[in-house]
Amino acid sequence: MKFLPGLLFGALLIAAPVAAAERLPAVLHVHSTLSTGQLSLDELATLAEQGGIGALLLSENYLLRVEYGLPPFRALTRVTYTERSVLASGIDEYLRRVEEVRRRFPRVLVLPGVEVMPYYRWSGSPLRFDMTASDTQKNLLVFGINDPHVLRALPAIGNPYTGRYTWQSVLDAAPAVLIVPGTVLLAVKRRRRQRLGRAVVVVQRRSWFAGAVLCTIGVVALGRAWPFTSEPYPPYENLGLTAHQDLIDAVERAGGVTVWSFPEAQDSGARKVGLVNVSWETAPYADDLLRTFRYTAFGGVYENATRFERPGDGWDRLLREYATNERRVPAWAVGESGFHEFSAGKRFGTLQTVFLVNARSEAAVLDAFRHGRMYALHRTAKEALELGAFTVSAGAATASSGDTLMAPPGTPIEAAVAIDASDGGAHEVRVALVRDGAVVEAWSGVTPFRARHRATFDGRPSFFRVDARGPSPHRLLTNPIFVKP
């Protein structure tokens, strides 16, 4: 339609629910020294407090363990690579440390979360001196679970708390049986006749070498295979997205939230393990978001160039499926930081998820998370775009991000957008209003920006969202508002 000056719809926008809610800037996906980060929890909380950040959503690595074993005795022959993670060092200790930093920094909400690697798979062979571990970064972030018993039992490859007994358990335990004949050889003296000239002497000897070898193999097998449970998600098979969906469902049952992490980022590397070249790789996997269900959100804005959230692409397909009741849970977009340390130009706090809350509490943040009351933000250290309001109205009814507006066919509807700048200044901004995967309005102006779009609801389930951009890297991506008959 057309761009409208700032005060034209001031009364409407101030009355909208978005304006009434408090903006709580948060840094989502942060690692500390408890896992793979380089800053302590206190240092991170200090940065947040100094930067005006209201919440830290920690994503400590849940379990960083990759292993390979030769068949059939995989436990006996396995080689393992591990890095620091909270499951290995103790879930109770992790939650205790978070509680301590909360007491020291009451002005910053610190939410404990984990980054889970649900599954990886091996290809290649050590016999060919070349192996690849795939999908080691196809990860999910988990928040909202503070029960240590539940957190310990998350479905994830390598989790010792979720093992089960299978035929592989029998194979792994089999070499331990060698302790029995080994012990017999060490304990029992064997009689031998030995001729000395014309005389025959009976000599009693134990089989020290053979007995020691058998006992050593048995003891090593016992230690490596104990408690003889097998991996529910063996990395030697292609299980697709089974483990990822199991994790999503387990978290949903526990009342938590899940986030697909960096779906369009690529990760690869290689190192020598003895004579074997071992590489790892994770290709962009945005299409997998269309193949999984019931997760809460995905990383929609981060440092990589992305396509999934573009008009008409994967995100709009997901939203269309939700609007038409093909999905029970919509997929919200978040700003994802992935902060480990200050390196390679990495900054703290420039990628944010801004929650729209009615109270500054962990419960309010998680409630906003589940219901899509937040927007993704890429900013600089000095200034940022701010969502003054984003609403869709039908008569006296008004909905904001994450809401569903009910309206009969033929009802006039109006989408209202307000974009401000954190410093109150006039900054160039381009704003796209997306409806059902297509850009229905594209405006250019300066902050404070106000605009509206009018249409008549035709009765088909619909959704609206806003993508606003300023000079690079400034960007603000809202979550959708649904309209249904």
List each model region and its residues.
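Extended, charged catalytic domains and RNA/DNA-binding interfaces, predominantly
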Residues: A20-P485
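Bacterial N-terminal signal peptides
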Residues: P5-A15
